[in-house]
Amino acid sequence: MRIALGIEYNGTDYFGWQRQREVASVQEKLEKALSKVANHPVEVQCAGRTDAGVHGTGQVVHFDTNVERKMVAWTMGANANLPKDIAVRWAKAVPDEFHARFSATARRYRYIIFNHALRPGILGSGVSHYHGELDEKKMHEAGQYLLGENDFTSFRAVQCQSLSPFRNMIHLNVTRHGHYVVIDIKANAFVHHMVRNITGSLIMVGRGEQDPEWIKWLLEAKDRKLAGPTAKAEGLYLVDVDYPEEFDLPRESIGPLFLPDNLN
């Protein structure tokens, strides 16, 4: 049978999601925990392979097993064997045609900036910090130039292995919540470092170095060297993954923490 799981994790101490030799990864820790519950080796497939230091509240995985367990056994059993910075949020039996990556129709990320003169103490590894003034309204205005089907070469990592730079941006909203500026981005898929590269350029708009229209020019230029720097990993969260309704996967609050699903 095939089981889907919702996963939450703090990526600070991991070299990304994907299993690697000799370094800690979220995938490795999860597979070890599930293997103990299943009493056989388990290999998971995920919706999105996050980079080193990136977090997740809405990661989705699936795995196959011939062992019969109640869903609560998978959630409670895995959590009992996982480190404190990784947790299973839900479990559900799914049909064999479900695939955590290939069945997904959209992914959603949030990038959180603590916008204050002084750095944070609590949550220091869960947010990015920018000390100067940021105009979130201009950042939001700039982001609207990226909506729709576009060539995101200007916001694509040089080492990106995707065959196409085209992605469909569904929404990009920038809002302020006290000292926190949140960039909420949803697309059908993302090229490597796309969210962090967009964020780096939006920050340049927010601090007045560039006008909002500059983002439109960057998009049309199709040149990564012209865009802003890649934003730090610690502020980024994979918060949600969309699937066809037929799979009826559980829905949890996407967060992180107190942030509501709808920030508008």
UniProtKB/Swiss-Prot annotation:
KW DNA repair (keyword) present: no
Single GO term (MF): tRNA pseudouridine(38-40) synthase activity
Reaction(s) catalysed (UniProt annotation): uridine(38/39/40) in tRNA = pseudouridine(38/39/40) in tRNA
Active site location: 51
EC number(s) recorded for this UniProt protein: 5.4.99.12
UniProt keyword annotations, A-Z: Isomerase, tRNA processing
Role played: Formation of pseudouridine at positions 38, 39 and 40 in the anticodon stem and loop of transfer RNAs.
Name of the featured protein: tRNA pseudouridine synthase A
